[in-house]
Amino acid sequence: MEYKVTPPAVLREPLVTPNKLLMGPGPSNAPQRVLDAMSRPILGHLHPETLKIMDDIKEGVRYLFQTNNIATFCLSASGHGGMEATLCNLLEDGDVILIGHTGHWGDRSADMATRYGADVRVVKSKVGQSLSLDEIRDALLIHKPSVLFLTQGDSSTGVLQGLEGVGALCHQHNCLLIVDTVASLGGAPMFMDRWEIDAMYTGSQKVLGAPPGITPVSFSHRAVERYKRRNTKVKVYYWDMSLVGDYWGCFGRPRIYHHTISSTLLYGLREAIAMACEEGLPALIARHEDCAKRLYRGLQDAGFELYADPKDRLSTVTTIKVPQGVDWLKAAQYAMKTYLVEISGGLGPTAGQVFRIGLMGQNATTERVDRVLQVFQEAVAAVKPDVQVKGKM
């Protein structure tokens, strides 16, 4: 029988992967130690060596999250998978969920929750600000939700949401708290148990500096008990916490096959977490906060205006208002074409309004802050020469 579709000519060409400096909102550049780990031989998804690596990762995630939750594991997915899984496991048809909206990820979580049959309510913060505890309390009283969803660090707006006291407040109202820490973990304090957070997830490709595609997640005892009281099965097999948790050895039952996990991604994530543990959370967070302050000073000294309120700024993603008359896309293209430096535009509610500069993982250094400041100022001046940039680094 004749094969009429021929091998594509493009696959006879060599693979090209330029070495770019990723100073956008993620992914960040992976350390060489992570890349080296990922070149190791592939293992089977139930080989004892693979299960040992998974156990190592679980312990590391508990440290990063500051939790002792037994239901701590990883999903074979991007950070969106964490959002899907936390919502999918804790919501049933008709359940009221309150979304704390500080940017695009409030919109995305509301969309997902609607698809799972939830009754979605939204409380919006002021532009560029986080929600206060009083605003959250008032919304809980009005809407009486069974779940509150918050994004600790919204990468679209550069806003850091305060969390201390929110979990206790939720539990006074018989409400569970879900928190997205994809863009914030390692760049801001996080105490999952102390702050009484019930479900939380992060991304592998931000501060941790591993490739995207594997997402740490954790569920509290309260969340597990809520899951056990469900009247219906979790709507998506792939996200079911009991099934994935059994694969990860969380509940004391025999480990079962759930899906074929990427051993390569496990290697990279393990080493990325090991590096974070070696540095330690206090030093890791301080490094990101110090670099962010250096970036803020440099931008403001050059005459740029920051988008987020000073008291609510996220250290890992800085949002800069696009100066009048500047085409943000042309400026970003200039930075990439001239220097192979990634600078991003806005997302969702900030699309066309801001630039976004990310300082994450090994890109959170004084040298890279100074580099991105230099490139950013030159790029803006190049596409709009009459914009006054006060000085160059």
From Swiss-Prot:
Q: Where in the cell is it found?
A: Peroxisome
**Molecular function terms, GO-annotated:** alanine-glyoxylate transaminase activity; L-serine-pyruvate transaminase activity; pyridoxal phosphate binding
Write the record's keywords in alphabetical order, separated by commas: Aminotransferase, Peroxisome, Pyridoxal phosphate, Transferase
Recorded superkingdom: Eukaryota
Report where it is expressed, by tissue: Expressed in head and abdomen of adult females.
Q: Which residues carry this modification: N6-(pyridoxal phosphate)lysine?
A: K206
Any one Gene Ontology biological process term? glycine biosynthetic process, by transamination of glyoxylate
Give the GO cellular component terms, alphabetically: peroxisome
Q: How does activity depend on pH?
A: Optimum pH is 9. Active between pH 7-10 (for alanine and glyoxylate as substrates).
The protein's predominant localisation is other
InterPro entries reported for this sequence = Aminotrans_V_dom, Aminotrans_V_PyrdxlP_BS, PyrdxlP-dep_Trfase, PyrdxlP-dep_Trfase_major, PyrdxlP-dep_Trfase_small, SP_NH2Trfase/AEP_transaminase
Q: Give the multimer and partner information.
A: Homodimer.
**Name recorded for this polypeptide:** Alanine--glyoxylate aminotransferase
Organism the protein comes from = Aedes aegypti
The record lists the lineage as: Eukaryota, Metazoa, Ecdysozoa, Arthropoda, Hexapoda
